[in-house]
Amino acid sequence: MDTSLPSAILNNMVTATLILDDGLAIRYANPAAELLFSQSAKRIVEQSLSQLIQHASLDLALLTQPLQSGQSITDSDVTFVVDGRPLMLEVTVSPITWQKQLMLLVEMRKIDQQRRLSQELNQHAQQQAAKLLVRGLAHEIKNPLGGLRGAAQLLEKMLPDPSLTEYTHIIIEQADRLRALVDRLLGPQKPGKKTQENLHQILEKVRQLVELESQRSIVIERDYDPSLPEILMDADQIEQAMLNIVSNAAQILSHQEHGKITIRTRTVHQANIHGKRCKLAARVEITDNGPGIPPELQDTLFYPMVSGREGGTGLGLSISQNLIDQHNGKIDVESWPGHTTFTIYLPILR
């Protein structure tokens, strides 16, 4: 096949396009791919696909299937991480003859911002529905627990043998334990008194608490935006939300060497928070270099009783999201092996 024709066509395509050999080495990148990956074509073609992409939400080996089947394949929801940047893409892979060899034509289209927003809103609605269900069940459990505890206390007074009170004590203790769990499931339903607070002071408290609790050496780095203004908030609740996230990261990193957490703040203009445009917002990024969150848990990570950590209760992140929601903010998460970032947005009202 004459390579000049596809080169002329591909160079003018608005779709980011790569040509790969059967070992997934990159043999060609068009100008649109240079823009997508923020690298020159010369640099791109010096790499294999696995070198260019730090992490992918699909098995890259599956991309060779068209070589055997002769048919194109398309995945409309793919995430590639390149130079630490997640790219949400629709990817189509087709067999092509290039320089007299059978190769792979990979076309990548960025997922439309509106579609991403729709996915985000749908996921948030599902999370809220799950939390409402759990809260409803928690309320149903809480009422009979009070009756059970009260009955045990009355029974204790009527027992003829004082030694039998050991059993009523067990009933009361377990009822209190269940009630405490239910209270955590319910969480605070609305924020307390809001005042103008310095977010960096709250984050410093969180950092100090986590460093004191960490049994092994974990480095916590800070990268604060000095221009970040004060924010109207319930300081205790925001501290709790941040503490849950940073503590989770520290507990996961306690099982590895050279654990590092980075807390970064930025002022963001025209932030999109659950479909609503916010003129000014604070963005807090909490990043760790731990093993990452398994892909199958990422969509349900903020649901009550879901935990990516052995021995975790599955309540910390759910509570954090609830507290941030009550401040009209949002939490996002991006994770792959060696990298997890929780991003919190809080509106700045003026």
From Swiss-Prot:
Tagged with keyword Transport: no
Primary subcellular site in the record, as a coarse category: cytoplasm
Gene3D superfamilies referenced in this protein's UniProt entry, alphabetically: 1.10.287.130, Histidine kinase-like ATPase, C-terminal domain, PAS domain
Any one cellular-component term (Gene Ontology): cytoplasm
Start and end residues of each PAS domain: 4-67
Intrachain disulfide bonds: none
Enzymatic reactions: ATP + protein L-histidine = ADP + protein N-phospho-L-histidine
CDD domains per the UniProt record, alphabetical: HisKA, PAS
Ligand binding (ATP): K330
An example molecular function term from Gene Ontology annotations: hydrolase activity
PTM annotation (Phosphohistidine): residues: H139
Highest taxon of source: Bacteria
Entry keyword set: ATP-binding, Cytoplasm, Hydrolase, Kinase, Nitrogen fixation, Nucleotide-binding, Phosphoprotein, Transferase, Two-component regulatory system
Residue span(s) of domain Histidine kinase: 136-350
PTMs per UniProt: Autophosphorylated.
Enzyme Commission (EC) number: 2.7.13.3, 3.1.3.-
GO BP, one annotated term: regulation of DNA-templated transcription
Subcellular location: Cytoplasm
Pfam family membership, one: HisKA
Cited SMART domains: HATPase_c (SM00387), HisKA (SM00388), PAS (SM00091)
UniProt keyword Cytoplasm present: yes
Protein role: Member of the two-component regulatory system NtrB/NtrC, which controls expression of the nitrogen-regulated (ntr) genes in response to nitrogen limitation. Under conditions of nitrogen limitation, NtrB autophosphorylates and transfers the phosphoryl group to NtrC. In the presence of nitrogen, acts as a phosphatase that dephosphorylates and inactivates NtrC.
Full protein name: Sensory histidine kinase/phosphatase NtrB
Organism: Vibrio alginolyticus
